[in-house]
């Protein structure tokens, strides 16, 4: 039997931001887009958090790693 949640909290539906905006190529120079997929500490967020598809997650990960090598994005954000 399924139990109902208490408190009425409804979880937000995750969607693939890249597919929804019809972005074909994830550019490593577009740091504004890539910063959506990085935590405040600088770690790449997993698919279960961002809601991206596996294919687009690979594109994002590759672009973030390229941006880090080119010094466009930091490896670690320290406060």
From Swiss-Prot:
A Pfam family per the record: Ribosomal_S18
Annotated coiled-coil segments of the chain: none
GO cellular component, one term: cytosolic small ribosomal subunit
UniProt superkingdom: Bacteria
Subunit: Part of the 30S ribosomal subunit. Forms a tight heterodimer with protein bS6.
NCBIfam families assigned: S18
UniProt record similarity statement: Belongs to the bacterial ribosomal protein bS18 family.
PANTHER family: 30S RIBOSOMAL PROTEIN S18, SMALL RIBOSOMAL SUBUNIT PROTEIN BS18M
UniProt name for this protein: Small ribosomal subunit protein bS18
Organism: Streptococcus thermophilus (strain ATCC BAA-250 / LMG 18311)
Gene that specifies this protein: rpsR
């Amino acid at each position: 039997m399924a139990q109902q949640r208490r408190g009425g909290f409804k979880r937000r539906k995750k969607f693939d931001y890249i597919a929804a905006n019809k972005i074909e190529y994830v550019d490593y120079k577009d740091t504004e887009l890539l910063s959506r997929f990085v935590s405040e500490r600088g770690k790449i967020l997993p698919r279960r958090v961002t809601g991206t598809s596996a294919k687009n997650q690979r594109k994002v990960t590759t672009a973030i790693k390229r941006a880090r090598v080119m010094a466009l994005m930091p490896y670690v954000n320290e406060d």
